[in-house]
C-alpha cells in the first residue's frame, strides 16, 4: 500500500491492485502490467512527462478514495506532496509487479526511479553553477542598451 501526507497532515492511501490496473488502462491508457512491451511506452511516458505522471497519480488516488472531491485530491499534491505521492506510487507498483510474477517490470521501475533521481541531482548541480550576479548584470546591461538605443522611425516623417 502506498501513502503520502499532504500539507494539512492528512494521510492519503492507495494500493496498486488488478482492479486499479484495469481502471487506469481503460481510463487513461496507462498499462502498468506491461509498461514497456509491444510498443507500449508507459514507463517512459510517466517518467518523462510530468502531466502524465500527475494524471496517473490523480486517477490512482481518486480510484482508491472515491468519496473525495477532485479539488481535494489536486490540493493534496501541493507543497511537495506530489513528490512523496510519486515515490509511494513507484514503490507500490514495484511490490505489485514482484508479487504478480513480473520481476522484470519491477527492475525496470527501479531503474526508472534511479534515472529520475540522477536527473534531479544533475539539475541541482547545474543550478549551483549559475552565478546569479552575472545573470543579473547581463540582464541589466541588455535592458540599459535597449533603453538608450534610438527609437526606429517608420516611414518618412518628411512626407506629409
Predicted features, each with a name:
Residues 1-10, 30-44, 48, 63, ...:
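Charged interaction scaffolds used for protein-protein
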Residues 12-14:
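Short, isolated positions in well-ordered beta-strands
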Residues 16-21:
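A short, sequence-level motif marking secondary-structure junctions
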Residues 23-26:
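Short active-site loop/helix that positions an aromatic residue
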Residues 48-59:
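Elongated alpha-helical scaffolds
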Amino acid at each position: 500500500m502506498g501513502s503520502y501526507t499532504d500539507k494539512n497532515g492528512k494521510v492519503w492511501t492507495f494500493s496498486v491492485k488488478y482492479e486499479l490496473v484495469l481502471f487506469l488502462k481503460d481510463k487513461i491508457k496507462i498499462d502498468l502490467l506491461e509498461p514497456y512491451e509491444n510498443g507500449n511506452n508507459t514507463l517512459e511516458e510517466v517518467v518523462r512527462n510530468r502531466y502524465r505522471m500527475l494524471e496517473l497519480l490523480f486517477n490512482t488516488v481518486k480510484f482508491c478514495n472515491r468519496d473525495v472531491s477532485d479539488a481535494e485530491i489536486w490540493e493534496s499534491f501541493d507543497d511537495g506532496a506530489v513528490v512523496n505521492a510519486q515515490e509511494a506510487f513507484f514503490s507500490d507498483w514495484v511490490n505489485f509487479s514482484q508479487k504478480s510474477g513480473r520481476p522484470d517490470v519491477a527492475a525496470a521501475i527501479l531503474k526508472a526511479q534511479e534515472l529520475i533521481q540522477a536527473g534531479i541531482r544533475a539539475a541541482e548541480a547545474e543550478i549551483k553553477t549559475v552565478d546569479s550576479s552575472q545573470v543579473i548584470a547581463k540582464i541589466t546591461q541588455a535592458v540599459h542598451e535597449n533603453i538608450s538605443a534610438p527609437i526606429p522611425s517608420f516611414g518618412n516623417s518628411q512626407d506629409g
